């Protein structure tokens, strides 16, 4: 039976890199679940590659039609969510689904799929290390970094709700630990 792998973590913990590396492991047979959003595409983004881009009206219509496993309005008329049809498409291909979602979305997906889903939370070694990583990126203002760190502290408060937790203090080690945990879960 195909399984669902939910990955959640604060910004700056290496979640995207961990997921990219896991996707290259053929034995895990993972396929990335593309989220839907009502925000406009940025730069080179294409519909169906980075996101499914929907108008706010279309997003709300699909919410009313119960077409989402989970969704959230992060700002006024700026929605993000996971379409049931996207998950079903991947499962029909006999692949395991991997999600990159926030803590609220992770809990919704876990509740919907139950024991068929494994919820993993990636923690930074410390809040100080997280702040340092975000500063080294050089992409955010100090105010944005403060907001991300504040949000991370709140998200870490949800870590106990996840099936497994891993600290990313060494990327290679963290990826290998998560890979082993996923392989064991898939083999059940």
UniProtKB/Swiss-Prot annotation:
One of its GO terms (cellular component) is cytosol. ATP binds at residues 9-16. It holds the Pfam family Guanylate_kin. Residues 2-183 form the Guanylate kinase-like domain. CDD domains: GMPK (cd00071). It is found in: Cytoplasm. Its EC number is 2.7.4.8. InterPro entries: GK/Ca_channel_bsu, Guanylate_kin-like_dom, Guanylate_kinase, Guanylate_kinase_CS, P-loop_NTPase. Its main location: cytoplasm. GO terms for molecular function: ATP binding; guanylate kinase activity. It comes from the Bacteria. The keyword Nucleotidyltransferase does not apply. It catalyses: GMP + ATP = GDP + ADP. Keywords: ATP-binding, Cytoplasm, Kinase, Nucleotide-binding, Transferase. The keyword ATP-binding applies. Belongs to the guanylate kinase family. PANTHER family: GUANYLATE KINASE, GUANYLATE KINASE-RELATED. Essential for recycling GMP and indirectly, cGMP. This is Guanylate kinase.
């Amino acid at each position: 039976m195909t399984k669902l792998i939910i990955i959640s973590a604060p910004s700056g913990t290496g979640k995207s890199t961990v997921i990219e590396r896991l996707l290259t492991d053929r034995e895990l047979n993972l396929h990335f679940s593309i989220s839907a959003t009502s925000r406009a595409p940025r730069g080179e983004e294409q519909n169906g590659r980075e996101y499914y881009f929907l108008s706010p009206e279309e997003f709300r219509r699909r919410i009313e039609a119960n077409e989402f496993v989970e969704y959230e309005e992060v700002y006024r008329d700026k929605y993000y969510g996971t379409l049931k049809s996207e998950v079903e498409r991947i499962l029909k291909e006999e692949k395991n689904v991997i999600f990159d979602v926030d803590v609220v979305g992770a809990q919704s997906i876990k509740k919907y799929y139950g024991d068929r889903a494994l919820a993993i939370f990636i923690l930074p070694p410390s809040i100080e290390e997280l702040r340092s990583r975000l500063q080294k990126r050089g992409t955010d203002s100090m105010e944005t970094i403060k907001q991300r760190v504040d949000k991370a502290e709140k998200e870490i408060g949800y870590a106990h709700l996840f099936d497994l937790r891993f600290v990313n203090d060494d990327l290679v080690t963290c990826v290998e630990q998560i890979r082993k945990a996923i392989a064991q879960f898939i083999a059940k």
